[in-house]
From Swiss-Prot:
<feature type="domain" description="Calpain catalytic">
    <location>
        <begin position="80"/>
        <end position="320"/>
    </location>
</feature>
<keyword id="KW-0378">Hydrolase</keyword>
<comment type="similarity">
    <text>Belongs to the peptidase C2 family. PalB/RIM13 subfamily.</text>
</comment>
<dbReference type="GO" id="GO:0006508">
    <property type="term" value="P:proteolysis"/>
</dbReference>
<protein>
    <recommendedName>
        <fullName>Calpain-like protease palB/RIM13</fullName>
        <ecNumber>3.4.22.-</ecNumber>
    </recommendedName>
</protein>
<feature type="active site">
    <location>
        <position position="135"/>
    </location>
</feature>
<dbReference type="InterPro" id="IPR051297">
    <property type="entry name" value="PalB/RIM13_Calpain-like"/>
</dbReference>
<keyword id="KW-0645">Protease</keyword>
<dbReference type="InterPro" id="IPR038765">
    <property type="entry name" value="Papain-like_cys_pep_sf"/>
</dbReference>
<dbReference type="GO" id="GO:0004197">
    <property type="term" value="F:cysteine-type endopeptidase activity"/>
</dbReference>
<feature type="active site">
    <location>
        <position position="276"/>
    </location>
</feature>
<comment type="function">
    <text>Required for the proteolytic cleavage of the transcription factor RIM101 in response to alkaline ambient pH.</text>
</comment>
<keyword id="KW-0788">Thiol protease</keyword>
């Protein structure tokens, strides 16, 4: 203890300074060159082997500083303590966290004080301490020591022990302030029972990271704890859902296995504990040799069919490096405010895997959610063929690790997406065997065959519902084909129903929708498919059934035809989408109404009539001032109601124009709304003229 205080309080300013250099390099992103060179001279004169080794490791890592390495330093915190991505063998006496006492449950604390339950080291093999609920960690430790050893996990340097565990996307360093666990006067300890002190140090590091220095553990699962110890891929499946060939496939890869019983029941004939994990020592034929971590030397042998009956969960860990030569990892931040706006994979973090070879290639991908105080949050990983709007597969769980094994055909691609129900940092670990298999973050903007349109609804007047819903004009261009199959995905971010319409852009009255699902869409996501002509403009209208809606929506348009290019532009049904517009409310007390107006130059005209107050029958026409020939007109008398009537769109060459309205019958207490859109500025001239009074 005295030696440790010397390290922390007086002596090792050089170690503290090295820690500050790490912090400046990776967190603050600025290292003073003069300060660093001065520090190197100090280390040379100190003649400390461990310090020199730690400095060399720092210099090497600085030369290879990448986005990944910086991200791993920026995400080194868990439970308020720091765990840098350093190897235990290179860390020396670097102390990253202040001393803090572990917390014990009341029964554990009472047992410790009474000296009744702590155990000594008189055991031949690793055993779970009966007062600690860490069967999963002990099973993991049994399997890891037996399969790949723990020599590289722990390094002793004087009064400091350094332990490597895998979490938060990297192999990370846990500094223990004493190379021993807490003991009573008899040198008995409340820890894993083992003749190897390194096992106790590994367990202490595990409880610090996984449970925030709290020995009152409710357990985890062996697959996750095995990953934390050695970094092997974790997989958790229900025994009832897999067959023995499935198990054999992983055994052939050298996998470690463990089994978990039901939380509520066990089969009495097998004498197993409820809600407890067991290590699988080996499998001979179809017979599993199983060990209870609480009891050393007691091996249970069960055939596969009995295993399926007696156990609920099968835990698998396997080393992907044995199957693949190439490894990449990608760190990203999952922001639920951004990525959970809509029920669509197009809003999720996505990575594209491209196979540019003549043969199909296997790919193994693991998405690792970083540690947080929130447990049992759901995560989902999906696979997309090409750029389809519907995923091929989606798998999810709540353990924080989700992995997928896929095969990418020759000259093809697959897209991986990740979903979480909360904010988190995440890491994608990806293994493959070909340097020609390329992986990169993907965005829908990279595709010419996929258009993603974002918009929003805002509260509007009931008088404007038809014309003021958001709309987009789009066209699918292709040099060779006349028609394509089109898929659409429509998502919105409120609980109200919605509707989607598609029209030919030439259908200026919007009378013949090519797509209009009968009735409103009740769910905040809908898919459609239809055939459209290429090189032909269309208009799509996104409607909310609630005029007071204040919410975002997203529309995706996709075609599988190679060589297609989708172009889009926002438009509006109001005023024909033209730049200049005005509306005028006119009384229908007179039978004939003349509205003169002027335009600044020759222009397109889009004229809409509707009446919210009462149905009307009228005819309407536009003339050049002084001319008897109509530029555009209704085909005689037409009914006008709350569904707008659009006059044929026309081009007016003259600047002085007159809009003439003639009613079949006057309606004194009613009005008609006139909306005019044009390409240039215009204005009505003077007062309305009632021709019936002239």
């Amino acid at each position: 203890m005295e030696a440790l205080l010397a390290v922390e309080e007086t002596g090792n300013d050089l170690w503290k300074e090295l820690k500050e250099l790490y912090w400046a390099q990776y967190v603050q992103n600025s290292v003073d060159k003069v300060q660093f060179e001065r520090y190197v001279r100090k280390v040379k004169s100190a003649d400390d082997y461990w310090l020199v080794r730690a400095l060399l490791a720092f210099s090497d890592s600085r030369k290879a500083c990448t986005f990944n390495s910086r991200f791993e330093w920026l995400t080194m915190q868990a439970h308020g303590r720091q765990y840098p991505p350093l190897a235990s063998k290179d860390a020396g006496k670097l102390i990253w966290n202040a001393r803090r006492e572990f917390r014990y449950a009341e029964p554990q604390q009472a047992a410790y004080k009474q000296l009744a339950r702590p155990r000594g080291d008189a055991v031949a093999d690793i055993q779970q301490h009966p007062d600690l609920g860490n069967c999963s960690m002990v099973c993991a430790l049994i399997n890891v020591k037996r399969t790949c050893g723990t020599a590289d996990m722990v390094a002793d340097c004087g009064d400091v022990a350094q332990v490597n565990l895998f979490f938060n996307g990297a192999r990370r360093l846990v500094t223990l302030h004493r190379a021993e666990v807490r003991q009573n006067m008899r040198r008995e300890q409340l820890a894993v029972l083992s003749p190897d002190m390194h096992d106790k140090l590994i367990e202490q590091a595990y409880f610090e990271v996984a449970h925030g220095m709290n020995y009152e553990s409710m357990g985890s699962n062996t697959a996750m704890d095995t990953y934390m110890l050695c970094g092997w891929f974790p997989l958790v499946v229900e025994t009832s859902e897999v067959d023995f060939p499935f198990v054999q496939r992983y055994l052939a890869r050298g996998a470690m296995l463990a089994l978990g019983t039901h939380a509520t029941r066990t089969i009495d004939s097998f004498c197993l504990r409820k809600n407890h994990d067991y290590a699988v020592l080996d499998v001979c034929g179809t017979v599993f040799r199983i060990r209870d971590p609480l009891v050393a030397g007691n091996v249970i042998e069960l055939a596969w069919e009995d295993v399926r009956t007696a156990f609920h969960l099968l835990y698998i860990n396997w080393d992907a490096h044995t199957q693949c030569q190439l490894y990449e990892k990608f760190h990203f931040r999952y922001n639920s405010a951004v990525h959970n706006r809509f029920m669509s994979w197009l809003n999720k973090p996505t990575y594209r895997v491209v196979n540019d070879t003549e043969s199909e290639l296997p790919v193994y991908a693991l998405f690792e959610r970083h540690l947080s105080n929130r447990k049992y949050d759901n995560s989902i990983v999906g696979v997309i063929s090409g750029e389809n709007l519907v995923s091929d597969t989606e798998e999810g769980n709540n353990i924080g690790m989700q992995w997928v094994e896929l095969t990418v055909p020759p000259h093809s691609s697959r897209i991986l997406f990740y979903h979480s129900n909360t904010n988190t940092n995440c890491t994608l670990h990806l293994f493959s065997n070909s340097p020609r298999l390329k992986v990169a973050k993907w965005s829908s903007a990279e595709s010419s065959r996929l258009a993603v349109l974002d918009g929003c609804w805002q509260p509007i007047s009931k008088n404007l519902t038809f014309t003021h819903w958001p709309a987009f004009k789009f066209e699918i261009k292709h040099p060779e084909t006349d028609g394509v199959h089109v898929s659409l995905q429509f998502c919105w971010a409120n609980e109200h129903s919605a509707a989607l319409f598609i029209y030919h852009a030439s259908d200026y009255r919007y009378e013949k929708p090519l797509l209009h699902r009968p009735g409103p869409l009740p769910f905040p996501q809908a898919f459609f498919e239809l055939a459209l002509d290429t090189n032909t403009p269309y208009v799509v209208l996104c409607q909310s059934m609630d005029v007071g809606a204040d919410a975002a929506f997203q529309l995706a348009i996709q075609t599988e035809k190679q060589g297609s290019v989708i172009s889009t532009v926002p438009t509006s049904r109001a005023y024909g989408g033209l730049r200049f517009h005005t509306s005028k409310l006119v009384s229908t007390a007179a039978k004939r109404i003349e509205l003169p107006f002027k335009v600044s130059r020759s222009t397109d005209l889009h004229i809409t009539l509707y009446s919210k107050s009462s149905p009307l029958v009228l005819k309407c026409a536009v003339f050049s001032d002084g001319s008897d020939e109509a530029i555009t007109a209704t085909p005689g008398f037409v009914p006008i109601n709350d569904y707008p009537y659009v006059l044929p769109i026309t081009f007016a060459k003259e600047r002085s124009l007159v809009l003439l309205i003639e009613l079949q019958d006057t309606v004194p207490d009613s009005t008609v709304t006139i909306e005019i859109g044009s390409n240039c500025a215009f204005n009505f001239c003077g007062h309305d003229v009632d021709l019936a009074r002239v």
